């Protein structure tokens, strides 16, 4: 009898072991393929919170489609989707105006080329790290595929801070950055663009260096000036597109932007041209911001003044309040406490949290249009 019990115990232990391995590899009855993948992403990228957040949101949103088609699991489609094809980290050394040498870190994540060459912007900001570049590159896959064009997804950048740097310092940094980057990009391989901290000026410096090194003039960078191969309306496209999308959303509810009070965060390309288009459709935009705080203008943001300050003088948003007598600058504050009908987060990732979302609802906001990459936290979305 004792021998039989021992045999049964060993058998039970073996069965449990097989079940444990199977559950971890293929998912148990209580854990779906999507749940397995979310856990896999969290465990494998534990030090990359932004990427984990983006991947989790995407995976959860495609749950019904994936779980209705076993083929995706059989071919390990999601395992391949969440892993970049190539990630490059490189050193950038450059000299400031005093001759002192500085070193920054550069990144290029080439996430997916299933339907075409990698495509995605370059971001210069001190917060840049591998997690942020991976999250941006991952989301770029889907944004690009939705255009219907044969382009894949990627992203890059550096922890270089352009604020407070002279024109020559920015030029030297961009040239050094491209000297390291040019080896992994090309018109049929990877086509970078601009993002935070990288506008037409920076793209021009990098394109010039690429042309100097390779002797080629092909369109390896988008966002160039019109005089050397750029596209009309490239600068305005994202901001205008955001407002057109919000207008169509409202039309589905027998409403429109006309006559609405709008708060916008940010003061870069996306924010500036979202403000411009919202004003042209009859909306009243009352805020703009940067990392130092925001301005509130009860008369409506004056786009010409905003462009002069941010694009020509490259000054802080606080300068706007000095030019407009009725405008007020709020240092270190967010725009979400300002009463509005529509909110357009156009600054950076995770800028709109759960408490901000509650504040918007309390103040009567009826629509949120996301212009930045993942501007709302998961809690805010819920």
Tell where the protein language model's regions lie, with residue ranges.
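Rossmann-fold NAD(P)-binding glycine/threonine-rich loop
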Residues: 347-382
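Phosphate-coordination loops involved in phosphoryl transfer and adenosine-cofactor binding
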Residues: 258-261, 340, 365
């Amino acid at each position: 009898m004792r021998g039989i019990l021992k045999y049964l115990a060993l058998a039970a232990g073996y069965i449990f072991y097989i079940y444990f391995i199977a559950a971890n590899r293929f998912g148990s009855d209580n854990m779906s393929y999507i749940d397995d993948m979310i856990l896999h992403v969290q465990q494998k990228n534990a030090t990359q919170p932004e990427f984990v957040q983006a991947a989790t949101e995407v995976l959860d949103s495609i749950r019904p489609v994936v779980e209705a088609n076993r083929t995706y699991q059989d071919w390990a489609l999601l395992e391949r989707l969440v892993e970049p094809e190539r990630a490059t980290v490189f050193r950038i050394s450059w000299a400031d105006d005093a001759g002192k040498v500085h070193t920054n870190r550069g990144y290029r994540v080439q996430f997916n080329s299933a339907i075409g060459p990698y495509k995605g912007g370059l971001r210069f900001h001190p917060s840049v790290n591998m997690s942020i570049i991976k999250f941006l590159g991952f989301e770029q896959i889907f944004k690009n595929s939705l255009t219907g064009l044969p382009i894949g997804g990627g992203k890059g950048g550096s922890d270089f801070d352009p604020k407070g740097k002279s024109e020559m310092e920015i030029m030297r940094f961009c040239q050094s950055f491209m000297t390291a980057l040019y080896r992994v990009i090309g018109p049929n391989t990877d086509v970078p663009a601009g993002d935070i901290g990288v506008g037409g000026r920076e793209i021009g410096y990098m394109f010039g260096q690429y042309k100097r090194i390779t002797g080629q003039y092909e369109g390896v960078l988008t966002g160039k000036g019109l005089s050397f191969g750029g596209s009309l309306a490239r600068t305005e496209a994202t901001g205008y597109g955001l407002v057109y999308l919000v207008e169509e959303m409202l039309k589905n509810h027998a409403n429109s932007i006309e006559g609405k009070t709008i708060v916008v965060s940010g003061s870069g390309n996306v924010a500036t041209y979202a403000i411009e288009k919202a004003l042209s459709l009859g909306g009243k935009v009352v805020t703009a911001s940067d990392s130092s705080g925001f301005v509130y203008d009860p008369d409506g943001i004056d786009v010409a003044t905003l462009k002069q300050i941010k694009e020509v003088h490259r000054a802080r948003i606080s300068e706007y309040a000095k030019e407009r007598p009725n405008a007020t600058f709020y240092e270190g504050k967010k725009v979400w406490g300002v009463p509005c009908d529509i909110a357009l987060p156009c600054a950076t990732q995770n800028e709109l949290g759960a408490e901000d979302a509650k504040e918007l609802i309390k103040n009567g906001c009826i629509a949120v249009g996301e212009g930045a990459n993942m501007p709302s936290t998961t809690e805010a979305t819920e």
